[in-house]
Curated annotation (Swiss-Prot):
Bias type Low complexity, positions: 287-296
Top-level lineage group: Eukaryota
Organism for this UniProt entry: Mus musculus
Pfam families: MAP65_ASE1
Protein name (Swiss-Prot/TrEMBL): Coiled-coil domain-containing protein 87
Length: 855
């Protein structure tokens, strides 16, 4: 009864306290809601078709929104346009109009389409601003690609993200699930729903490549990848329904009275934790629709719903703190500060704080170690790490059994190198149920195998790869050679190739022969009678190349000359039919002739293959190479030695008149004349110059050197023939290289070029082989002559031994110079002709393309 009596006394006090608050404006009241239409009006709305969400207007809205986004970013207009085009192209190509949901009414379908439209606009802006941020930061942090390459890479990634976050079927499914969840929650809470802002995805505020703050104007832009849940929650409509304002007096009455006599002590953290756990959570989780894997799904944002009421100050414990924004772990629980400190409370010592901190860390470590399997199973540490308690229990037991068996074998000292054989089970038949006429069930068993089995085990090792053509172990040519035996076409092609090589190249050159056939120089009328066949064998021969051909045919019987009829011996007045010996003459002529039976008998004994005759495939006899008779020339006659008193010092170009041979007559003069003739012949054949001839005359005209002259001439005559043969071969090689070493031959037709190159290589090898065989013996002969007589054998005034080492290279060099001279002459003529037409001769002469230029 006492409180009721005090109420009238407190009202004036309340009004006096609340009167100053009337100076402040009250909360803005929302306009009164229009009265709801009756249920009869809902039927006409269902007949009105929903507005289609077409891609054209949607792209215009997206383009307009992106044009006003990210203006502070320091990027060019071309880059902004490129990113905008990527987003719009993705929408134009892959956009699909959402279907009408039959479970929703007309109004909710319209709201769902508005929600989808807002989602597309927000997601496009988020992607656009994020890639603007990457476009600014990537070139600064990684100077690997150029700006254009970086823009291309970002455009490709943006197109992929647009497919995932804008046009993917998962987007519509996730939006529909979120819309239905909010709709159900709104109906459950009576139309009062308060939505919290969606959390940023984890890692949103990670450190960027450039330290903050950026100069890009994108400091509010997250630096990590987006996810579908975050964008869906970002597109939620934040409409807070209004409720009638409470009476201030009732608010004051609801404040509890403080008990000043009771002291507030420290509130233990465990009590707070229990209160938090026991408190019913009004959050409603949403289904997760993320394109990433299940192990990396981000936590969805809960939906909180509570009744609004007047609060003196916001509740900081249930709000969205900075730690939640940064996705940090919750701090360790500490006791809350009491409103009134007790007198008995004392500050904790430092040692106790450290001890409590260590206990908390040990508790966290035990929680982390409890996730893994304990190594108390008796296994070694390495094996224990590889096992898990739940997923590898069977494997763990097998390892324990194996270790136990190994330990028993080690303790017993008996090692069984071969594993125990498992006796195979007898094969059991397999029965198959079969219905016959839908009445009788017959079980058909398979054939039972034999009970015999092998006691020995068989081990077949698989053959490795012989070669791997992908790594370049075998080239294409080697593979073709390995497969040549399996292809019939290759062998046939080789046969035809060999046959065509026998055909003459000039078999189609009809113009090479005589255009007019010469007339015969014999009387053809005398060869028309049959009596001409038995005349002399050399008489009817017109082609002189066939002389002696009949002499090789020994099998042909020779007719008796007395019985051979002759037109010249017959009387002219008698007729041929009136001859009495007519029958005997014809029989004698028919006997040696060949009949048709003889011809067929001859063919039966011969081969039926005439291809070698058609294509002239005769066995070529190996060319008989006559070896140069150099070995017999090695026996050089030693000249008589010079006496000490007769030996005179020879000086080139100086003639000692006192040593000249005196003129005389007799056999000695004829001998000297013979030596002179032989020496002149050597000079002519070896093309010795005049100065060298004069030196030889001066040297060997003395009495002392005259005795060595016959041996010198004989040695030079022995080496003359090999030198001549080598020079002839060298001349053939020079004539051959004049055409074969011409670089212009490479510009001919390919089919002709290959055959020509093969023939050139074959002929060059043949000449080189003959030269090498000859030079090996010729070098030893020349060296011996030079060592015996003290002077070398010369050719054109040059030591032939030195010439053999250089003449091949010199020949190729001078052939090249001759071709250059011809090309320069031809170019000069062409230049002069062009100058005569143009009337200008001030231009420089340009060397042909195949002529190397020298500086």
């Amino acid at each position: 009864m006492e409180p009721h009596s005090q109420e009238p006394d407190l009202k004036p006090i309340y009004h006096r306290l609340l009167s100053p608050l009337s100076l402040f404006p009250s909360k803005a009241k929302p306009p009164p809601e229009p009265p709801k239409r009756p249920s009869q009006d809902a039927t006409p709305l269902q007949s009105i078709p929903l507005a289609k969400l077409k891609v054209g207007p949607l792209c215009r809205q997206v383009s307009k929104r992106l044009a006003s986004s990210g203006r502070a970013a320091r990027v060019t207009a071309k880059d902004r346009l490129r990113l905008t085009e990527v987003i719009l192209e993705e929408l134009k190509c892959n956009w699909r109009e959402p279907p009408i949901e039959p479970i929703l009414d007309y109004e909710n379908n319209q709201k769902l389409r508005q929600r989808l439209e807002s989602y597309v606009l927000i997601s496009s802006e988020q992607l656009f601003v994020r890639y603007l941020h990457l476009l600014v930061t990537l070139p600064t942090s990684r100077r690997v690609f150029t700006e254009s390459a970086t823009l291309s890479r970002l455009a490709v990634n943006l197109a992929r993200d647009c497919t995932v976050f804008l046009t993917s079927p998962d987007v519509y499914r996730c939006l529909l699930a979120d819309f239905q969840t909010l709709l159900n929650l709104k109906h459950a809470q009576g139309g009062i729903v308060k939505l919290r802002p969606p959390p940023c995805p984890p890692g949103t505020f990670k450190l960027c490549p450039i330290p903050w703050p950026h100069s890009t104007g994108l400091d509010h832009m997250p630096c990590s990848s987006l996810n579908l849940n975050y964008l869906v929650q970002l597109s939620r409509p934040y409409d807070f329904p209004s409720e009638p304002e409470p009476d201030p007096v009732e608010e004051l009455k609801s404040i509890p009275q403080l008990k000043s006599r009771q002291q507030l002590l420290w509130v233990p953290s465990m009590i707070k934790d229990k209160e938090i756990e026991s408190r019913p959570s009004p959050m409603v989780p949403l289904p997760s629709h993320s394109p990433s894997s299940e192990s990396h799904q981000f936590p969805t944002s809960p939906v909180h719903s509570w009744l609004q009421r007047g609060q003196s100050m916001p509740c900081l414990h249930e709000g969205w703190s900075l730690a939640d924004e940064l996705c940090l772990l919750p701090p360790s629980p500490h006791p809350l500060t009491p409103l009134i400190l007790a007198s008995e409370s004392k500050p904790l010592p430092f040692r106790d704080i450290v001890a409590e901190d260590l206990k908390q860390k040990m508790k966290i470590m035990r929680m982390e170690w409890s996730r893994y399997s304990l190594l108390d199973s008796g296994l070694p540490p390495l094996l224990g790490v590889l096992t898990r308690r739940l997923t590898a229990q069977h494997h763990l037991e097998k390892l324990q059994q194996m270790i136990k068996s190994l330990q028993e074998e080690e303790a017993s000292g008996k090692w069984d190198l071969q594993p125990p054989r498992i006796i195979p089970l007898h094969p059991q038949p397999v029965t198959v149920a079969l219905k016959v006429h839908d009445q009788v069930i017959v079980q058909v068993a398979t054939v039972q195998l034999s009970e015999r089995y092998f006691n020995d085990s068989f081990h077949v090792e698989g053959a490795g790869v012989l070669y791997n053509h992908l790594t370049g172990e075998l080239d294409g040519k080697a593979i073709e050679e390995m497969d040549a035996d399996r292809l019939v076409g290759n062998t046939t092609g080789e046969v035809y190739k060999e046959l065509m090589s026998r055909v003459s190249v000039s078999h189609l050159s009809f113009e090479e022969g005589d255009q007019i056939e010469p007339s015969a120089d014999k009387d053809w009328s005398s060869y028309l009678a049959s009596s001409f066949l038995h005349q002399d064998k050399h008489m009817p021969i017109i082609n002189r190349n066939l002389v002696g051909f009949y002499s090789r045919r020994t099998s042909t019987p020779k007719p008796v000359p007395e019985k051979v009829p002759s037109l010249t011996l017959l009387p002219r007045h008698k007729s041929w039919d009136k001859r009495p010996n007519r029958h005997g003459v014809w029989m004698n002529w028919l006997k040696p002739s060949v009949s048709s039976e003889d011809y067929f008998k001859y063919l039966s004994f011969q081969e039926s293959d005439f291809l070698h005759v058609i294509f002239q495939m005769y066995e070529k006899e190996a060319p008989v190479e006559v070896p140069v008779p150099v070995q017999e020339y090695l026996d050089i006659q030693q000249p008589p030695p010079l006496l000490q008193d007769e030996e005179l010092e020879f000086m080139q170009g100086k003639w000692d008149w006192s040593s000249v041979i005196e003129d005389g007559s007799g056999p000695g003069r004829a001998y000297i004349h013979n030596l002179q003739q032989r020496l002149k012949r050597l000079w002519v054949m070896l093309e010795v110059p005049e100065q060298n001839r004069l030196d030889m005359v001066i040297k060997y005209s003395s009495n002392a050197r005259l005795q060595q002259l016959p041996a010198l001439i004989k040695a030079w005559e022995q080496v003359l023939k090999p030198i001549q043969k080598r020079e002839s071969l060298l001349g053939r090689l020079e004539w051959f290289e004049q055409q074969a070493s011409d670089p212009n031959r490479f510009f001919q037709k390919p089919d002709l070029l290959m055959n020509r190159l093969l023939e050139e290589n074959r002929f060059r090898s043949y000449l080189q082989r003959k030269l090498n065989r000859m030079e090996s013996n010729l070098v030893s002969l020349l060296e011996r002559i030079e060592s015996v007589f003290g002077e070398p054998v010369t050719f054109k005034g040059r030591s032939y031994l030195k010439k053999m080492k250089q003449d091949k290279v010199e020949m190729l060099y001078w052939l090249q110079q001759q071709r250059r001279i011809r090309n320069l002459t031809q170019a000069q003529k062409t230049f002069r002709q062009s100058c005569t037409f143009t009337g200008s001769s001030s231009q420089a002469l340009v060397a042909p393309g195949n002529t190397p230029t020298t500086h």
